């Protein structure tokens, strides 16, 4: 993400055409992580910035270049096993609506306690006010855009830290004479050995990691002990806590739900959440029978755990600080 955005911003700052050699990076990104759609979306404001800065006589040519680049970037993103379907996943995720509020990483920032995000944000605001920072209009739009994402959803907090410096680097360097002149040019032209060293280090670490076959999540944050101490996989369909779905996938056991919310849909996710929190107790009992649940794997704080302890058809067969397992009698 940083390489993609930084290279596009540099093209705008240096008033050059979009970097066509960057397109393979989009293909790689699309095959690694769903955030590639953010990279596609950012082409629009960056292209508008390029148009804004271009001379009037050059704007038509700049528009054609960035439009072609955007189309090729979309095509590059479609070079994955699922084609254009991967782009649609983002829209299905956003369409989950109220179900997103049940997932911690999709909730808004919580400012009831002072945290690192708030300290950094307030510090940046204080610096801007103290030094009288001014920015071009479209850079303001970009910074406010990532700030909005960072405030509205916890999972996007990193965007502000990763991308805001990229948006601000050239405007601040031009505004503050101590950073202007040759220093700006040097900042935009790093020595070749630095990225080369980083690439070699990445290849080396990846190669060493691939030789290990004992890599697994730590037991203190996963239901590993609960699963290995019981025969829960043989009990039948498992009703699991949302946070345990990924680990069940990891060990090859089918979960009731996992982090791929776009596959389950809003109604399914909300029903699961309301059932386990006993907001709808009758539906929780119906759910157990409807899906022929043979065992449950829940966190100790889940309200449904106390109810299962009292149901005659269920018995607790394992519990620790991480997970509680119930099975049908």
Predicted ranges, named:
Residues 269-322:
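Periplasmic/luminal catalytic loop of GT-C fold multi-pass membrane glycosyltransferases
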Residues 231-269, 293-301, 326:
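Short periplasmic/luminal acceptor-recognition loop of GT-C membrane glycosyltransferases, typified by
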Residues 19-34, 72-77, 144-150:
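Membrane-interface alpha helices of multi-pass inner-membrane proteins
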Residues 42, 149-177:
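Hydrophobic/aromatic-rich transmembrane helices and adjacent perimembrane loops
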Residues 34-133, 161:
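Transmembrane catalytic cores of multi-pass membrane glycosyltransferases
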Residues 10-27, 62-68, 137-144:
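Short hydrophobic alpha-helices at membrane interfaces in multi-pass membrane enzymes
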């Amino acid at each position: 993400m940083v390489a993609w955005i930084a290279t596009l911003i540099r093209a705008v700052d240096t008033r050059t055409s979009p970097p066509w050699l960057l397109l393979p990076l989009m293909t790689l990104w699309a095959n690694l992580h769903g955030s590639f759609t953010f990279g596609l979306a950012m082409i629009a404001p960056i292209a508008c910035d390029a148009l804004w800065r271009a001379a009037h006589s050059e704007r038509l040519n700049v528009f054609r270049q960035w439009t072609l680049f955007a189309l090729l970037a979309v095509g590059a993103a479609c070079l994955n096993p699922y084609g254009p379907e991967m782009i649609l996943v983002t829209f299905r995720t956003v369409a989950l609506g109220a179900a997103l509020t049940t997932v911690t990483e999709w909730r808004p920032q919580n400012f009831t306690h002072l945290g690192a995000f708030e300290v950094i944000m307030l510090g940046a605001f204080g610096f801007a006010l103290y030094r009288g920072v001014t920015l071009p209009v479209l850079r303001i739009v970009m910074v406010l855009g990532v700030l909005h994402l960072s405030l509205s959803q916890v999972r996007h907090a990193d965007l502000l830290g990763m991308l805001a410096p990229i948006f601000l680097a050239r405007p601040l360097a031009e505004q503050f004479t101590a950073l202007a002149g040759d220093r700006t040019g040097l900042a935009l032209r790093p020595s070749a050995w630095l990225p080369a060293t980083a690439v070699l280090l990445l290849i080396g670490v990846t190669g060493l990691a691939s030789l290990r076959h004992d890599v697994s999540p730590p037991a203190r944050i996963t239901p590993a002990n609960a699963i290995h101490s019981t025969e829960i996989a043989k009990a039948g369909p498992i009703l699991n806590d949302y946070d345990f779905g990924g680990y069940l996938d990891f060990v090859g056991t089918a979960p009731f739900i996992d982090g791929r919310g776009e596959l389950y849909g809003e109604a399914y996710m909300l029903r699961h959440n309301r059932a386990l929190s006993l907001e709808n107790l009758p539906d929780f009992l119906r759910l157990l029978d409807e899906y022929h649940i043979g065992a449950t794997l829940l966190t100790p704080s889940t309200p449904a755990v106390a109810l299962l302890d009292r149901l005659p058809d269920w018995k607790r067969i394992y519990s620790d600080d991480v997970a509680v397992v119930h099975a049908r009698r």
